[in-house]
């Protein structure tokens, strides 16, 4: 039996069917250009959601918003139930759980293939080890100080939180009518085939000023956290050397699985386009992500190299990985996708399982698109 790419411990293999990404009223603008227009979608554990549509329809921007490589103009993105816009959330902590593969591979040309794959696991693994060691070293002293001053400190924090919460509610009340008036001034114009949105400049300035105060107050509230006793935590590894050895062992396992074990010590410049993209995929998998995001992974490849990359993605999909894939490969979308989204003009105009999507399209724009590409 062939060795699997995903490990048995991979978290994406659990909780199948449970929503892992939820997008609520997502809007993204670049200046006055409306790129994403009030999108609400969800991705469930184990799903392979394929996004297709004409160029300029917002597909790649939507994908980049999912792990906050692009900041949404408005709306919410929840990952495992956590609002990524919440000021208390460590975005980088959640990005670790989302592997992303880009059109142009984005390998480090000054590092060997193996170093490309081990770079992030080693850096993060050692950082986590040091953090755990610091935590355990200072915990006894911290607990002594907490026992002596904790009650008084928490009393002060409670008063501060009450004051900040009151200010937050006041600012929200102040902001609401301004936003309503601002929305009423919205105008949309078609310029060179793109939707350009504009609002009243004075109301925009007033809205941003209040929103900025609200954000600063919410940030202060998020940092006003009551103290509590700490517990010692287990170390994630015995040593930095152990972290490196585990990362290198996993890198070689992944390279062996995709038939590139002999390329471990060469540099990316010596690889073909297809080999580079396969390395980019296993580099993302080396972090043991819960979701994989693919942004047109074959668009920069020569036609004869597309198949080897698609075969690898299919294998990862068959092993249970949750995926969101932007692609122009219609046959691949039909074969791999459990649900297909059609995006155009910044909106999801239609979505359905592959058989229904390709066999019985409903939206006129989708029928027009499929007639051109199939």
Regions inferred by a protein language model and the residue ranges of each:
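Catalytic Walker B motif of ABC-type/P-loop ATPase nucleotide-binding domains
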Residues: 292-295
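Conserved ABC ATPase signature
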Residues: 267-271, 275
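ABC ATPase NBD coupling module
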Residues: 84-99, 135, 142, 154, ...
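Conserved signature/switch motifs of ABC ATPase nucleotide-binding domains
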Residues: 266, 287, 319
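Helix-to-loop junction immediately C-terminal to a conserved catalytic motif
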Residues: 67
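Conserved ABC transporter NBD signature motif
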Residues: 75-86, 130, 134-135
């Amino acid at each position: 039996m062939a060795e699997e790419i995903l490990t048995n411990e991979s978290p994406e293999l659990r909780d199948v069917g449970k929503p892992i990404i939820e997008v609520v009223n997502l809007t993204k603008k670049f200046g006055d250009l409306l790129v994403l227009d009030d999108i609400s979608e969800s991705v469930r554990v184990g799903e392979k959601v394929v996004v297709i549509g004409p160029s300029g329809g917002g597909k790649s921007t939507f994908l980049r918003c999912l792990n906050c490589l692009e900041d949404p103009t408005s709306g919410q993105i929840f990952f495992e139930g956590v609002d990524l816009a919440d000021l208390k959330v460590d975005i980088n902590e959640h990005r670790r759980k989302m592997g992303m593969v880009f059109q142009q591979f984005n390998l480090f040309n000054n590092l060997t293939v193996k170093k490309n794959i081990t770079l992030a696991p080693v850096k993060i693994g050692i950082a986590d080890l040091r953090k755990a060691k610091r935590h355990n070293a200072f915990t006894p002293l911290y607990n002594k100080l907490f026992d002596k001053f904790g009650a008084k400190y928490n009393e002060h924090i409670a008063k501060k939180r009450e004051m900040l919460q009151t200010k937050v509610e006041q600012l929200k009340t102040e902001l609401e009518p301004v936003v309503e008036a601002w929305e009423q001034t919205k105008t949309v114009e078609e310029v060179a085939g793109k939707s350009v949105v504009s609002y009243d400049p004075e109301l925009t300035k007033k809205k941003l000023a209040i929103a900025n105060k609200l954000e600063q107050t919410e940030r202060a509230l998020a940092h006003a956290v009551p103290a509590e006793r700490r517990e010692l935590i287990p170390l994630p590894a015995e040593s930095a050397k152990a972290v490196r050895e585990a990362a290198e062992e996993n890198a070689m396992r992944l390279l062996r699985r995709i038939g590139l074990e002999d390329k471990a010590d060469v540099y990316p410049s010596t690889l073909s386009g297809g080999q580079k993209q396969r390395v980019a995929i296993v580099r993302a998998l080396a972090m043991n992500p819960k979701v994989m995001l693919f942004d047109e992974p074959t668009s920069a490849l020569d036609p004869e190299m597309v198949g080897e990359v698609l075969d690898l993605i299919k294998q990862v999909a068959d092993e249970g990985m949750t995926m969101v894939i932007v692609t122009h490969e219609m046959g691949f979308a039909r074969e791999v996708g459990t649900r297909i989204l059609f995006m155009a003009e910044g909106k999801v105009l239609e979505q359905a399982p592959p058989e229904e999507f390709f066999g019985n399209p409903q939206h006129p724009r989708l029928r027009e698109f499929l007639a051109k590409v199939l």
